[in-house]
Amino acid sequence: MTPALFRRALMVAGGLLLLPAPSHAHLMNTGLGPFYDGVSHFTLTPEDLLPALALALLAGQRGSRTGRLALFALSLAWLAGGLAGLTFPANRSATALTTVSFLALGGLVAADARLRPEWVTGLALVLGILHGYLNGAAMSQAKLGALGLVGIVTALFVAVTLVAALVVALRAPWARVAVRVTGSWIAAIGLLLLGWSFRAA
């Protein structure tokens, strides 16, 4: 192969590398099927992961009973909201509502709010229905169906269980302060996202 021919072949290969690949705007595509697409969607989407973790931190701060109530309420509400989103999908964005959940839950964790178990469970129900509906509508558009939703709820259940149990087990004062600092970071992320959503509007 002559140097000129080699350069041409290299230029063609480089040009082919610059061709755009298909992109997916909202849902992750692992190639492993809808269940794992749902799992990866939850773990890689901050709009879903961070409010769920903030709720787990809040529930863990209030003790094991509150943690258990919030865990099951959040998971079941997320599933119910997701099924509603699959059945009656809407194309509307709820960025402001999801970022308010960052702010509210992160602020409650940072303040170490002494909420009764019923209030934390109510917050879990509202969060689960809102985010579940949005996930269900996205699953409907991506044709992942109920199996993708089950993947999301499974990942949610595991994450909330682990985080709430970790916080319940913390006894050292510095560790409790670290939980509050984490809540303030989540609230700050929510504030940034809220500002960004108004800027884009």
What do these predicted regions represent?
Residues 2-201:
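Membrane metalloprotein/metal-transporter helix-bundle signature
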